[in-house]
Amino acid sequence: MRHRNSGVKLGRTSSHRKAMFQNLANSLFEHELIKTTVPKAKELRRVAEPLITLAKNDTVANRRLAFARTRSAATVGKLFTVLGPRYKERNGGYLRVLKAGFRAGDAAPMAYVELVDREVNTSAE
């Protein structure tokens, strides 16, 4: 029986999964838009959204928890100085997953993961 077993394995060991989602979350918080496969994007929400919720309350304990989960001082700094205040009034739903077709090599379904309410650079002007 698989009762209470949530999360997808994605064909990886638990340590590989943990490292992969840590790296994906760090990239997402740094760039605010990343492209990945749809299953990874959907699972990334379960990792990244609680970190933003944590960043809404800036305490030393919360900063230490965020660092324990990301292992990146730059990410923690951005979470608590930029992203936490940005989403102070929003109750969840900080990420948007947009389908982006299929990858050329193996036809894997791809998706963009972006932070809602991010500043979009319009450098085409």
Curated annotation (Swiss-Prot):
Keyword terms of this UniProt record: Ribonucleoprotein, Ribosomal protein
GO biological process, one term: translation
Superkingdom of origin organism: Bacteria
Gene3D superfamilies (alphabetical): Ribosomal protein L17
One GO term describing the cellular component: cytosolic large ribosomal subunit
Any one GO MF annotation of this record: structural constituent of ribosome
UniProt xrefs under PANTHER family: LARGE RIBOSOMAL SUBUNIT PROTEIN BL17M (PTHR14413:SF16), RIBOSOMAL PROTEIN L17 (PTHR14413)
Subunit description: Part of the 50S ribosomal subunit. Contacts protein L32.
Family of this protein: Belongs to the bacterial ribosomal protein bL17 family.
Name assigned to this protein: Large ribosomal subunit protein bL17
Organism the protein comes from: Acinetobacter baylyi (strain ATCC 33305 / BD413 / ADP1)
UniProt lineage: Bacteria, Pseudomonadati, Pseudomonadota, Gammaproteobacteria, Moraxellales
Name of the gene: rplQ
